[in-house]
UniProtKB/Swiss-Prot annotation:
GO terms for cellular component: membrane; plasma membrane. Keywords: Cell membrane, Disulfide bond, G-protein coupled receptor, Glycoprotein, Membrane, Olfaction, Receptor, Sensory transduction, Transducer, Transmembrane, Transmembrane helix. This is Olfactory receptor 5P62. The gene is Or5p62. SUPFAM superfamilies: Family A G protein-coupled receptor-like. The chain crosses the membrane at residues 29-49, 58-78, 103-123, 137-157, 200-220, 241-261, 275-295. Its main location: membrane. It is a multi-pass membrane protein. GO terms for biological process: G protein-coupled receptor signaling pathway; sensory perception of smell. GO terms for molecular function: G protein-coupled receptor activity; olfactory receptor activity.
């Protein structure tokens, strides 16, 4: 039952997600592609977590943050992808009102945690390159745990903020969501409440949050680049810069998509374009991060070789 009639007011109890396409053949193709990407995402990020856990040489702050980034990537992808895969195989792509809120809050939680973790990793690189002699002191286990805990608290606050707005909206119909998951923007379009003030508050908050965390990342890299330029040897500069390229690539991909979806004016792009970029943000980035950090990191590649070598000896 999609609606409850309460006197003169109709309340929506479930929503229909329109998804990516109505074409049955294309649905099957997308199901196969997205399922493969999701399985690789889970395998890649889980392998990263396990490799860091069993390799003593990877028990450093940078890899501590990386293991949490991998778990957050799995959570972000898992908050949307399983439901999307089920909807590819069913004719009526419905999700309950409560399920929609849970999906939205999960995506908001993991998305915000990733912001803070990327900022923490930028600080880690700043200390490692600009203050190497004080690295063990400034990036102690206690500091790392506090930074990660702060990231999860920030994610919880963001999820609470977004969830509060969602459950404060009234939905009287229609109930067809023009997206593949319950994102806040298409949900506001369906609300029969006056969302004009909420839309301004949410847009301002999203823009401020994104640009503030980006600023926190840019400032450390400004000092990092100055320090790298002062290194006389070409080999030294390349080695110092190589430790930052993976993180910079991840930051560029993540912030580029977030700014497009949540910061740029809605009039500058269509809903279909928003779906494509959201798919990249929810599905492609989580599968790319393990590749970005492993292919450009000799320590991870060496640790992986050691694990394979040990298994061949057993």
């Amino acid at each position: 039952m999609a609606f409850i009639y309460n006197g003169s007011q109709t309340t929506v109890t479930e929503f229909i997600l329109l998804g990516l396409t109505d074409d049955p053949v294309l649905k099957v193709i997308l199901f196969c592609i997205i399922l493969c990407i999701y399985l690789v995402t889970v395998f890649g990020n889980l392998s990263t977590i396990l490799l860091i856990g069993v390799s003593s040489k990877l028990h450093h702050p940078m890899y501590f943050f990386l293991s949490h980034l991998a778990s957050v990537d799995m959570g972000l992808s898992s908050s949307v992808t399983p439901n999307m895969l089920v909807n590819f195989l069913t004719e009526k792509n419905t999700i309950s009102y409560l399920g929609c809120g849970i999906q939205l809050s999960s995506a908001a939680f993991f998305g915000a945690v990733e912001f803070f973790l990327l900022a923490a990793m930028a600080y880690d690189r700043l200390v490692a390159i600009c203050n190497p002699l004080l690295y063990s002191t400034k990036m102690s286990s206690q500091v790392c745990i506090q930074l990660v805990a702060g990231s999860y608290v920030g994610g919880f606050l963001n999820a609470s903020f977004v969830t509060h707005f969602f459950f404060s909206f009234l939905f009287c119909g229609p109930n067809r969501v023009n997206h593949f998951f319950c994102d806040l923007s298409p949900m506001m379009e369906l609300s029969c409440s006056d969302v004009s003030i909420s839309e301004i508050v949410i847009s301002f908050s999203a823009g401020s949050f994104t640009m503030t965390t980006l600023f926190v990342i840019v400032i450390p890299y400004f000092y990092i680049f100055i320090t790298i330029l002062k290194i006389r040897s070409t080999e030294g500069r390349q080695k110092a810069f190589s430790t930052c390229t993976s993180h910079l690539t991840a930051v560029t991909l993540y912030y580029g998509t977030i700014i497009f979806i949540y910061v740029m004016p809605k009039s500058t792009y269509s809903r279909d374009q928003n779906k494509v970029v959201s798919l990249f943000y929810m599905l492609v980035i989580p599968v790319l991060n393990p590749l970005i950090y492993s292919l450009r990191n000799n320590e991870i590649k060496d640790a992986l070789k050691r694990q394979f070598y040990r298994k061949t000896l057993l």
